[in-house]
UniProtKB/Swiss-Prot annotation:
It comes from Vaccinia virus (strain Lister). May affect virulence through inhibition of apoptosis. Its main location: host cell. This is Golgi anti-apoptotic protein. GO terms for cellular component: host cell Golgi membrane; membrane.
Length: 237
């Protein structure tokens, strides 16, 4: 059996250095990275979908969670704490995977709690629209040769506008304002799906698959939530 050359071994080691991007790695490394990212993402959404379905379709769970605001806040702040921990320890294996599991569970509980306040049909519509948008945007970005890194500054500026507008929206209860903010938010996170899909190939290293999956997971969750609110407000008009 032939042994790999020293130059081949060296190039593989270089591929895994955090300073090199996935795009500069070998085809084998790139494909392995993508399998890890989207494999983790699929597992995250299986857990999230299953948790949401239990809370949505079982009246006892729906009633319990709607009467337990402390639990909703605990899962929300738990998600925030775990995402900060993941950011700090994203290179520490297997700690990053344990934190990823904890974050996904906490975020699933948070999302499941939110959807209990919406009609089942609206939730299903938002789910289907989110899935279709994610698949279309991912396919487009991975096949495109355009440089989407230029979107970054504009998207982060739009995100801050969205956050500040959302805070103002708490005090201004207007259906038209909610509709506009929901549509704007959905567009912003469609942009983030394109940006983060491009970034996972051109900015992240082959060992940062946990960070890549978290970025995409959060993009999809936020897109879903904005579409959910958009559909809810639209149905009231």
């Amino acid at each position: 059996m032939a042994m790999p050359s020293l130059s081949a071994c060296s190039s593989i080691e270089d591929d895994f250095n955090y300073g090199s991007s996935v795009a500069s790695a070998s085809v084998h490394i790139r494909m392995a990275f993508l399998r890890k990212v989207y494999g983790i993402l699929c597992l995250q959404f299986l857990l999230t979908t299953a948790t949401t379905a239990v809370f949505l379709y079982f009246d006892c769970m729906r009633t319990f969670i709607q009467g337990s605001p402390v639990l909703i806040l605990a899962s929300m702040f738990g998600s925030i704490g775990l995402i900060f921990a993941l950011t700090l320890h994203r290179h520490k294996h297997p700690l990053n995977l344990y934190l990823l599991c904890g974050f996904t569970l906490s975020e699933s509980l948070t999302l499941a709690s939110v959807v209990t306040f919406y009609d089942v049909h609206v939730v299903m519509q938002a789910f289907m629209l989110t899935t279709a948008a994610f698949l279309a945007l991912t396919t487009y970005t991975l096949q495109s040769k355009r440089d989407f890194s230029k979107l970054g500054a504009g998207l982060f500026a739009a995100l801050w506008i969205l956050i500040l507008s959302g805070l103002l929206g708490i005090f201004v209860q207007n259906e038209t304002v909610k509709l506009v903010l929901s549509a704007f938010g959905a567009l912003v996170f469609c942009g983030f799906i394109i940006y983060d899909t491009h970034s996972l190939i051109h900015k992240l290293s082959p060992e940062e698959y946990v960070l890549a999956s978290i970025n995409l997971y959060l993009d999809i969750i936020n897109l879903f939530l904005h579409l959910l609110q958009l559909l809810e407000v639209s149905n009231k008009k």
